[in-house]
Amino acid sequence: MVYVYINVLFIANFCSWGTTLLMGPGNWLILFFSALYAYLLPLDLQPRVSWTVVGVLAVLAILGEILESAAGAAGVTRLGGTRRGALYSIVGAFIGTFTGAMMGVPIPFIGSVVAAVFGGALGAFGGAYLGERERLHGDRFAIGKGAFWGRLLGTFGKLIVGAIMLALVTVDSIF
């Protein structure tokens, strides 16, 4: 019966990991479901998720957030952007992600995901561009481009951390 629970945990964590593409709290959901599993699974059932792994997952979730935030902010500030530009970039990424997810692109099965990721990056570009409105067009464009690449790299980094978390908890729950 424990292997049924392991499969449910894997499916919940995999779906949670996927929410990262939509600016969702995927890594935090992986941590939540894994901690809930470790807490609720009866002690006599083996194998189980250890609390040590749950602690490592917490550290990795924090690392993923820092990585995503730092990449996005660095994309704006590295090119001389202001805090307002960085804030507008975050808001633009949020709007772009959901607009992209709703509109999608005509790629079977993964069109909405691709559109959400690139919509978020384009939204970050637009937000940073609007946030630097007192600058010249060339500077605004460069800062927006930095926000675009920062958003893409931040999302990619957070996805990698989430994949490590998913692999870690899956291996620990099986062995």
Locate predicted features:
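Small-residue-enriched transmembrane helix starts and helix-helix packing motifs
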Residues: 1-19, 85-95
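C-terminal ends of transmembrane helices
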Residues: 11-21, 67-77, 130-134
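Helix-adjacent hinge/juxtasegments
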Residues: 59-104
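C-terminal binding/interaction regions
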Residues: 135-175
